[in-house]
Amino acid sequence: MMTTTSRYAALSRAELATLVPELLLIGQLIDRSGMAWCISKFGREEMLQIAIEEWAGSSPLYTKRMQKALNYEGVDVITVFKGLQLDIGAPPQFMDFRYTVHDRWHGEFHLDHCGALLDVEPMGEEYVRGMCHDIEDPTFDATALATNRKCQVRPIHRPPRAPADRHPHCAWTVIIDESYPEVDFVPQLEIVAASRAYHTELAPIDPSDEGLADYSGPLLSDVDFGAFSHSALVRIADEVCLQMHLLVLSYHLAVRARANGDAALEESIRYKSLIGIAGVAAERIKNALGLSADTKGALRVLELHPLMNPAAYVSVDVDPDFLHVRRSPAYEDGAWISLVSPVADLPLQAIVAAVNPYLRAEVSGTETDWTVRVVETDTAAKELPEVEVCKFSGGASWEFENRKSLPLTVV
């Protein structure tokens, strides 16, 4: 079967090594956008349940995809830890997981820095407890069950922090034991597993390409994305975009279950959530790759944006002067792109304004077949409120640092 050429393939190996952690962080920030609208419409308790269902309904699926893509399938704690390092739920440094391996079945991790905690602490103890207890208990196990259904992730200590500056932010044990009951899959998982996103075929990694073709070697303290081959980085970037789409499909199911048949309410929440992350993602991509603040730079950001990727899932014809979006598997899933059209263009406006507030997107065509051009104007656009909400997260302005990548041996 022919596979579509990735839009990330045109980037250099160095650019991809910069972009991949950005994409992982963007995936984490999806919730900073989405959960704000869930709190305002459904309240805090329902927001917690939405978050649990959202992650539990997607992370086992995308974790398995990444294991296969990078050839590190297994059943032990090392496999669990490798998966977390390539998971939008645990972007590097912003969620600074430090791992200890005692043996194949026993390990620990602690967070030297938890960006999500620092985002939530100002909101009060109820929100901290909700995230670090109510959400994490089922979702850590759900992520681990992709590797081994008899894996239990349990807290050593976790927030609310006492004292208030306690460090590390939290610590957990990860134990696999045959005597443990199997962790159950949530019912939503079956629906998300039937999606076109989950079954998207991406080009295999070329083992002859210079650099690492997989993550079958030792577990590393920090993944050095620069050590991977160009081919592997293209695949990782596409997989991370699919992680986002699977998470959002699961989020949509959870929102729909609470909208009680109110299609307008459901669509409004989904749309606002997309606008927020669209703008924040665009700004990070533009800055990370040092793209120009003109129409050309804006079109490049659109082309590389998770909204439009991977190419095998979202069909876009790229021209020097415009992008032409066509019907694709993403439309069948009701993915992000299905929320955008000539009469619903705010996600595109958020993207181009993040590149330069004097730019506007001009969109023409039908709901599922449209063209976007970028034009210069004389008036700076005011930042959209949905983007402002997403920027509440420290992740929106996070700066990555260079780190040494060291193999972790059994203690």
Question: Where are the language model's segments positioned?
Answer:
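N-terminal accessory segment detector
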Residues: 1-108, 115-135, 141, 145, ...
